[in-house]
């Protein structure tokens, strides 16, 4: 939009000669940068000095506010900024002005809001993200005395200012990364901050790790210098945080390489600290992340001549996760040709993917048009379409509701939406189904009066106005969901897109089942759900209450073909994101030693396993015949719960359902130290509230099982509060409650 202004006009009575509409256009088209210039911890409060970098001449018409937004919940607070002269503004914040009480895992993003001073001016406020230009910003951290948690300022990978709430933080920031013909040189600052442990850093080492069948680990010492310069401008209490400027040099000739294949190293930092008693404490960081998306980190390549062939060294970062790495390979003509062809092939595959994507878009558009046409046809009254996990299973809450309605409401016509590759169980049981995404399915879905689904439907499906959509969901939330997720690492999407699409699909839900009040609160916020929440307990758990008897257990054991005279341990570990050697090459082993378990417990127990399919397909149970049984592909995990005397799991949410049986549980967590950061992405304190003991070794597991086997064993003290919080609504009548709410009697 162009704007023409008569420069001969003059201001009258101190007022601008521009109209409000002209001013609006000018401010919307003016670049305004809001920059945090300084940050100081003033005895518990954070003092912020903010500079507004703009040529806009109408800023005097606006009042500026600092806005804080908690990333997970969306809760906001704001307060006015005080002008200290020119375009600089000052303010002070503490825990009391945060939009909600301080809790572990919170992240607050900072914005500057420009609001018209005059109430009669009809203009939306202008919101700008606050960027940061403060060196070593973490030094201004504060420990909240009420919660004993760190309130930690930091700069995001996009250069913006935020604070996060943590118990501890391993700080690693990079200033410069260079490569020469001799070495890789890295400078920056690092440290360790904690609200609990007063560790003093003794040494830091840079670790280069290569995975695969022949793992390599190399250590390089880091030169440290205490970071004290300018500290007086950041802290009024004189406290010197455990932060150090560092420099590390990695001689290229000391990095192992192979003439046959490329070696790829990930970078870690090893901390060696002293505790209060002078004892050495050692721990590693997670894989090092560059933390600056503006830095493309290109051109960091060095080629060295050796006796055999030239060797190429490259420092790189992964595009999405920003993790740093070093690639090393020979640079012979043969290798260069190989990578040249590989690059050409990669570009060809990329073009094919683009063409396929365009074709799929066209197909989706056609399907959507047909669906909308079909939805205008008369509704088929009392027709219900059920779907579980994208049509791949006959399971979960939809199954429980279907079986209840089949017995108690035969007047309804009920069909299952089934992926044709997973239709065998439906054929065996004689359950009516329609192949998912077929033409018949499209018309059936469009004309059905009810949908009963436990996961998201494709986003392109428009819900007809005559259809009632019951979303059952599929579990009590343990890990963060949807809008509560800080980052999303999934192929084909990003955090913003994932959240937007999730909320768009969730807006179609008319009813949502919640197993307890804890879940209701999370679902409402994370899904931004504002329609009817049915707080009923989970229908799928009716089976665990109504059929918990010796006859049912005996029948299931016969069906599973397992011994009836032995106790059963269900081992259901989760899949780890890092459970691989390289892309497409996974680790197919178990942390729990089955040899040792059989030797100590084989006379009294058997083990049934519910594993990730990649492990299940490649793990050989031959040596454990008669002791360990693989039921990873068994369709109904409820039946595995029912026959099990004991559950062993780790961070899987299966324990919420198993708790309904009031049977013992063990949590086998050998990697709890490295997994702890992920645990802090959970909704509750897993280590404190887990309804059973945490064990780290097979020996500890065996000892715990022997204690459970004793006649005087009682469930741990933590089980009662856990059951009261998560299972109090489960009574065997959840299906009935849901059906009576959604399928109202006519």
From Swiss-Prot:
Optimum pH is 8. GO terms for molecular function: CDP-glycerol glycerophosphotransferase activity. Pathway: Cell wall biogenesis; poly(glycerol phosphate) teichoic acid biosynthesis. The keyword Acyltransferase does not apply. Signal peptide: none annotated. GO terms for biological process: cell wall organization; teichoic acid biosynthetic process. PANTHER family: TEICHOIC ACID GLYCEROL-PHOSPHATE PRIMASE, TEICHOIC ACID GLYCEROL-PHOSPHATE TRANSFERASE. This is Teichoic acid poly(glycerol phosphate) polymerase. It comes from Bacillus subtilis (strain 168).
């Amino acid at each position: 939009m162009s704007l023409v202004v008569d420069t001969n006009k003059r201001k009258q009575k101190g007022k601008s000669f521009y109209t409000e509409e002209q001013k609006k256009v000018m401010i919307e088209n003016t670049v305004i940068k809001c920059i945090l210039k300084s940050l100081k911890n003033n005895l518990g409060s954070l003092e912020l000095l903010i500079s507004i970098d703009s040529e806009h001449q109408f800023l005097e018409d606006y009042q500026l506010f600092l806005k804080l937004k908690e990333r997970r919940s969306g809760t906001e607070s704001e307060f006015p900024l005080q002008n200290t002269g020119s375009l600089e503004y000052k303010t002070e914040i503490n825990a009391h002005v945060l939009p909600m009480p301080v809790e572990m895992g919170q992240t607050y993003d900072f914005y500057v809001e420009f609001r018209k001073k005059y109430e009669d001016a009809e203009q939306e406020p202008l919101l700008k993200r606050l960027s940061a230009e403060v060196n070593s910003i973490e030094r201004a951290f504060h420990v909240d005395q009420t919660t004993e948690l760190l309130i930690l300022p930091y700069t995001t990978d996009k250069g913006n200012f935020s604070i996060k709430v943590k118990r501890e933080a391993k700080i690693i920031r990079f200033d410069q990364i260079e490569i020469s013909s001799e070495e890789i040189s890295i400078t920056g600052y690092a440290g360790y901050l904690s609200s609990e442990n007063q560790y003093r850093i003794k040494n830091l080492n840079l670790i280069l790790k290569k995975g695969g069948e022949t793992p390599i680990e190399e250590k390089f010492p880091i030169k440290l210098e205490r970071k004290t310069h300018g500290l007086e401008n950041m802290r009024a209490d004189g406290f010197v945080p455990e932060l150090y400027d560092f420099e590390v040099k990695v001689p290229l000739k000391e990095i192992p390489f192979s003439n046959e294949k490329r070696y790829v190293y990930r970078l870690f930092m090893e901390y060696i600290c002293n505790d209060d008693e002078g004892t050495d404490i050692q721990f590693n960081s997670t894989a090092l992340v560059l933390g600056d998306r503006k830095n493309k980190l290109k051109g960091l390549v060095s080629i060295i001549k050796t006796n055999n062939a030239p060797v190429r060294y490259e420092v790189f970062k992964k595009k999405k996760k920003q993790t740093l790495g070093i690639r090393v390979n020979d640079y012979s003509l043969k290798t260069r040709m190989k990578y040249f062809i590989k690059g050409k092939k990669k570009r060809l595959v990329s073009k094919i993917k683009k063409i396929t994507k365009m074709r799929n878009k066209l197909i989706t558009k056609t399907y959507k048009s047909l669906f909308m046409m079909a939805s205008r046809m008369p509704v088929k009254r009392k027709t219900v379409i059920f779907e579980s996990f994208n049509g791949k299973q006959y399971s979960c809450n939809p199954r429980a509701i279907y079986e209840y309605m089949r017995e108690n409401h035969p007047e309804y016509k009920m069909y299952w939406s089934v992926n044709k590759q997973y239709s065998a169980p439906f054929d065996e049981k004689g359950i009516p189904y329609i192949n998912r995404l077929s033409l018949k399915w499209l018309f059936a879905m469009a004309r059905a009066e009810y949908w009963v689904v436990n996961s998201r439907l494709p986003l392109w499906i428009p819900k007809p106005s005559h259809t009632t959509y019951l979303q059952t969901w599929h579990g009590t939330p343990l890990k963060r969901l949807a809008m509560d997720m800080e980052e999303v690492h999934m192929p084909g999407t990003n955090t913003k897109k994932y959240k937007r699409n999730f909320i768009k699909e969730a807006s179609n839900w008319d009813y949502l089942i919640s197993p307890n009040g804890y879940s209701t609160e999370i679902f409402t916020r994370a899904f931004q759900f504002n329609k009817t929440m049915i707080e009923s307990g989970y229908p799928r758990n009716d089976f665990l209450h109504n059929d918990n008897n010796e006859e049912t257990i005996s029948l299931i054991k016969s069906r599973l073909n397992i011994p009836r005279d032995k106790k059963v341990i269900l081992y259901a570990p989760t899949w780890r994101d890092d459970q691989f050697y390289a892309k497409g090459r996974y680790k197919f082993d178990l942390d729990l030693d089955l040899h040792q378990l059989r030797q100590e417990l084989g006379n009294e127990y058997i083990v049934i396993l519910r594993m990730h399919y990649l492990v299940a397909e490649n793990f050989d149970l031959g040596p454990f015949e008669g002791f360990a049984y693989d039921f990873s592909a068994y369709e109904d995990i409820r039946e595995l719960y029912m026959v099990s005397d004991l559950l062993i799991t780790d961070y899987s949410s299966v324990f919420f359902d198993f708790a309904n049986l009031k049977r013992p549980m063990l949590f086998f967590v050998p990697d709890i130290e490295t997994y702890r950061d992920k645990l802090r992405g959970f909704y509750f304190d897993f280590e404190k509230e887990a309804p059973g003991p945490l064990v780290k070794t097979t020996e500890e597991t065996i000892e715990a099982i022997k204690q459970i086997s004793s006649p005087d064993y009682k469930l741990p003290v933590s089980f009662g509060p856990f059951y009261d919080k998560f299972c109090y609504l489960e009574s065997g009548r959840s299906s009935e409650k849901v059906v009576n709410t959604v399928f109202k009697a006519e």
